Regions:
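Class II aminoacyl-tRNA synthetase catalytic cores and aaRS-like
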Residues: 7-524
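Extended Gly/Ser/Thr-rich low-complexity repeat segments
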Residues: 602-619
Length: 636
């Protein structure tokens, strides 16, 4: 609430939200600046140097006049002296004020004098012109002679020493996280360098960058549930791109041999630690080559990015030290499954035989695919994928899941395709393109089911693309690694939200903002789509960001899957009954063992963790909460 009112007899006391008072005071200071003839929001800065340049080039700049601008992060006044630290995108620099050296307030020049410096607050954007010097304590500083206010901040920054702890706030107000946390600022800066390195690498290999449509009359190039929109000017429905692949192939048909696009992709599907509905990819197409060319290309590109954008080749990826200087492994999918299960899917006679393998891998029968090839892929996902730690190129996918790829001449049940796996995570998909228009049309027509148009399994009939192929597409191959997955690897993050500056979240309008701007309050959006760790959940409970209601239910889930020669057990929780939230998913624990685990014992372990960690945290947040622990629909 904006204000709380107590009525003591005839006396009424009103307690105003402290943020309201601070905001009003700062608005008053902005008005005071105007009364002095100074704009609190001038249009231009006279900056000549960034803070880091002043520090790095001190030997050349000492005693010279420079102008530095940035956000005021600290300010300390001691009589006729004052000290401040100003932050820009390169770092921080100290401003040193002597009353007699600072130019007086001057509306014409825009200077704010020492006597009026009280109109400046932490968080304001300021500018100083002065002489580069070193203080008696040895700190490189700027002896201020002219001082300007460039932007009056109306809201105070959170505690810069504690930083932001509430994950909901970090994701919604990433700008605050970056202002307060140098590590976050550097992480997103490094991602821009990564994208620049990709362009440099591809341009150096002779590729040409093209812009391809994000709004498409027919989505294609993959299987995913699309976002639909309506174009009023054309009077028809269209789709946001799930892929740009088919447009790149049109470019190759037009005669451009090496093309690429760095575009936005939209898939109306789930949100978790490695998936987001809107994401970026770099897609390439190379004429007169096959998928083996791209195996070398993608390996070289990752190594170039590591060295160019990050200055190293070793990265901690999901707890594993990966060295991109080492050659990548290459592995046939059928051989990988054979190695882990002892079954060669290439020799299976019936889909029932394939299902028996999945049954031994504890795959639920409801998830059994309809073909041997698709069953092999499911076995790969369960038995092989988690063990692919070192960068690995897995090739030889079944044709059932690869309608756009060219079949292998040696065995047409499989296609010339490979996927990239790093630290157990799929990071890109690549293949030799099917350029036979008759064969491709037959495949598409066989899979075409109009009733599934808006589902994730619909295979569209893009007749315009088929027509383009009939004019002749040369032998072509393409790659398509996701930029967010790459950023997770190179910045050593485990959650995709931490490499997306503006992650997609439900709209939220706080009570303070509703009162301030005269709009309707929209409570904090649920965090059910966030994959929270137990520690994050505890912190949000302790801070009051999450509040348990009178009744909370906790559903533990334990799953086992092979991890190389060992077995991995993973436990997670579903929590219901947190105020204003839906179901919250919590990652619990993982354990790896040589033997087949006792799942009942593992369930008890997870239950004990729930009792000692989750239940205790909920009870501290709300001692009156009744907690029910549920396993497989039954109360334990």
């Amino acid at each position: 609430m904006l204000a709380v009112v107590w009525n003591f007899g005839t006396e009424i006391l009103v307690a105003t939200n402290p943020l309201t008072e601070i905001r009003n005071i700062r608005i008053g200071k902005a008005d005071a600046m105007r009364h002095l003839g100074l704009s609190p929001y001038p249009a231009k800065s006279g900056r000549t140097h960034y803070s880091k340049a002043v520090v790095d080039q001190f030997a050349e700049l000492e005693g010279l006049e420079v102008t530095v601008a940035g956000r005021l992060m600290s300010f300390r006044k001691q009589g006729a002296l004052a000290f401040a630290h100003v932050q820009d995108q390169t770092g921080r620099l100290q401003f040193f004020f002597r009353k007699q050296r600072v130019k007086p307030t001057d509306a014409t020049a825009g200077w704010l004098g020492f006597a009026d410096i009280g109109n400046v607050d932490l968080g304001d954007i300021v500018e100083a012109t002065g002489t580069v010097m070193r203080t008696e304590r040895g700190e490189i500083s700027l002896m201020v002679e002219g001082f300007r206010l460039l932007t009056k901040a109306l809201r105070p920054l959170p505690d810069q020493w504690a930083g932001l702890k509430d994950r909901e706030t970090i994701l919604r107000k990433r700008y605050l996280d970056v202002i307060l946390t140098p590590e976050s600022q550097e992480r997103f800066a490094s991602i821009t360098r990564m994208v620049a390195a990709i362009r440099t690498f591809l341009n150096g290999r002779g590729f040409m960058e093209f812009t391809t449509p994000a709004i498409q009359p027919q989505y294609g190039g993959g299987t995913a549930k699309p976002f639909k929109t309506h174009v009023n000017a054309l009077g028809c429905d269209m789709y946001l791109a799930i892929s740009h692949e088919l447009y790149l192939k049109r470019l190759v048909t037009a005669g451009y041999d090496k093309v690429y696009t760095i575009g936005r992709y939209f898939r109306n599907e789930g949100i978790d630690r490695s998936h987001h509905p809107e994401f970026s990819m770099v897609e390439t197409m190379t004429a007169y080559e096959n998928y083996e060319y791209n195996m070398d290309l993608i390996e070289d590109m990752f190594r170039f990015i590591a060295q160019t954008a990050f200055g190293k080749t070793q990265f901690n990826v999901r707890g594993h030290m990966i060295d991109f200087a080492n050659p990548w492994k290459r592995l046939a999918m059928a051989d990988a499954v054979l190695d882990k299960t002892g079954v060669d899917f290439r020799t299976l006679a019936t889909v029932g035989d394939a299902h028996e393998v999945l049954r031994r891998l504890n795959v639920a029968e409801a998830e059994f695919p309809a073909t041997i090839g698709e069953s092999m892929v499911r076995a790969f996902e369960v038995a092989v994928e988690p063990s692919l730690i070192e960068p690995t190129l897995v090739h030889g996918h079944p044709i059932e899941i690869s309608p756009l790829a060219k079949p292998m001449a040696s065995d047409p049940r499989f296609v010339e395709r490979f996927e990239i796996f790093i630290a157990g995570m799929e990071c890109g998909d690549n293949w030799s393109e099917q350029n036979d228009p008759v064969s491709l049309f037959a495949t598409w027509k066989k899979r075409y089911r109009p009733e599934e148009r808006d589902s994730g399994e619909f295979h569209a009939l893009d007749l315009d693309f088929i027509e383009a192929l009939e004019y002749g597409l040369p032998p072509t191959t393409g790659i398509g690694p996701g930029l967010e997955r790459m950023a997770m690897i190179f910045t050593e993050q485990e959650n995709i939200d931490d490499v997306i500056f503006f992650p997609l979240m439900k709209p939220s309008i706080s009570s303070f903002n509703a009162a301030t701007y005269g709009v309707e309050e929209r409570p904090m959006a649920p965090v059910e789509d966030l994959a929270l760790t137990l520690e994050e959940f505890k912190v949000m409970l302790a801070e009051g960001s999450l509040m348990p209601t009178s009744k909370v239910s906790i559903k533990p889930h334990v799953r086992m899957f092979p991890a190389g020669s060992r077995n991995r057990v993973s436990g997670h929780l579903e929590v219901e009954g947190i105020a204003h939230q839906g179901v919250i998913h919590l990652s619990g624990y993982t354990a790896t063992m040589e033997t087949i685990p006792d799942m009942k014992l593992e369930a008890k372990k997870l239950g004990a963790m729930v009792e000692s960690v989750v239940v205790e945290a909920i009870k501290v947040a709300n001692p009156h909460t009744q907690i029910k622990l549920i396993w497989a629909g039954e109360t334990l």
